[in-house]
Amino acid sequence: MKLFALLVSITLCYSFPAPLQTNVSEPFGLLQKVSEQVIDPDYNIPEVKDAPAIPYDERNSPTHAYSVDISFHTTPSDMDCLRDQGYKSVFVRALNPIGNTYFDRNALNTINNAFEAGLGSEVYITPNINSTRSGADQISLVYQNLLANGINVRSIWIQVTSPTNWVAPMAVRIEFIQDMIRSAKNLGLSVGIYTSFYDWLEITGGWNTFSSDVFLWYWHVLSMGTDGETTPTLEDFRPFGPWRQATVKQFGQVEKLCGMIVNRNVYSTGNQHLSQIVHFSTHQENSSSEKKLIRVGGIGF
């Protein structure tokens, strides 16, 4: 079974490579994970187990759906497999925080593959507060690159995890996050934050004074792997920061699925809008034409 190069867990996407921590002294010790690790396709990792199958009676539930988050190259067959296993969407990383940050072109490939498989797509970014780019510039970098490559994004999720990566005074961190939220809204995007109670408290001090229309995608696992999964519902959510309800929950991390190592998520489907082709008029000199774009982003709308 092939395994891809990836960020093993979304909760630690831009620290330097580190060994797995086998002795976790407290519940959030799982933040000390492998990051940016290349996994040899022929290397057997016995501790990474196959993800449990989604029960058949939940694969077309009118109330909730399952998703995975991805930060690596995919193939059309990968997306077909996810669809056949009952998954409805993928969260795709579009900003790589390594160095000065750069647009992750793997996102284009995955969004197109997901669209062809009939899956929805959501875009998330892993920002870097130490980059010379401002928070607004990091949002703009992703937005402009997606648009230039035929992707019309409606919403964006901002990762706020791994406190050790946020090397700046707390006031600077808050302003950086606020700058990203403001920039995304100025571009007409809906905004979500990927975090947890612990991450949010450590990084922002529990900041709760921004707009309540920012969605929440929270993670809650007991440890990496299938044995560390929590229930695939949002019923364990407890209010923190400005949020009184959550939109998405990550309940499993570092699990084998369709030849990939992924994290698993669940979300309410009440208002979900799947990816679709949209048409835009483009007015050029002495002519008018139409441009087709894949529209992504719709969970929580």
Swiss-Prot record:
Ch-type lysozyme domain: residues covered: 64-282
Disruption phenotype annotation: RNAi-mediated knockdown results in partial sensitivity to Cu(2+) ions with less than 70% of animals reaching adulthood 4 days after egg laying.
GO BP annotation list: cell wall macromolecule catabolic process; innate immune response; peptidoglycan catabolic process; signal transduction; stress response to copper ion
Segment forming the signal sequence: 1-15
Inducing factors: By heavy metal stress conditions, in response to Cu(2+).
GO molecular function: lysozyme activity
InterPro entries: GH25_Enzymes (IPR051595), Glyco_hydro_25 (IPR002053), Glycoside_hydrolase_SF (IPR017853)
SUPFAM superfamilies, per database record: (Trans)glycosidases (SSF51445)
UniProt KW keywords: Signal, Stress response
Family stated for the protein in its record: Belongs to the glycosyl hydrolase 25 family.
Function: Plays a role in the stress response to heavy metals such as copper, probably in a kgb-1-dependent manner.
The protein's name: Lysozyme-like protein 3
Natural source organism: Caenorhabditis elegans
Gene that encodes the chain: lys-3
